[in-house]
């Protein structure tokens, strides 16, 4: 099993880097999707 890798960008909250995007909980989302990824504005 592949373990989730936390991004080096601490502006991201509760997200893990999955290939080209983030996985927030069980919901895949785009890197630039602030609402789904919970990024700090």
UniProtKB/Swiss-Prot annotation:
Query: Which sequence ranges are marked TM in the entry?
Result: none
Site (Interaction with trypsin) residue list: 20, 30
Which GO molecular function terms does the record list? serine-type endopeptidase inhibitor activity
* Keywords annotated in UniProt: Disulfide bond, Protease inhibitor, Serine protease inhibitor
Disulphide bond pairs: 15-26, 17-24, 29-37
Q: Its biological function?
A: Has two active sites that simultaneously bind and inhibit trypsin.
Identify this protein by name: Trypsin inhibitor
């Amino acid at each position: 099993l592949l373990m989730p890798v936390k991004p080096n960008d601490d502006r991201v909250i509760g997200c893990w880097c999955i290939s080209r995007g983030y996985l927030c909980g069980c919901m895949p989302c785009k890197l630039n999707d602030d609402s789904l990824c919970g990024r700090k504005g």
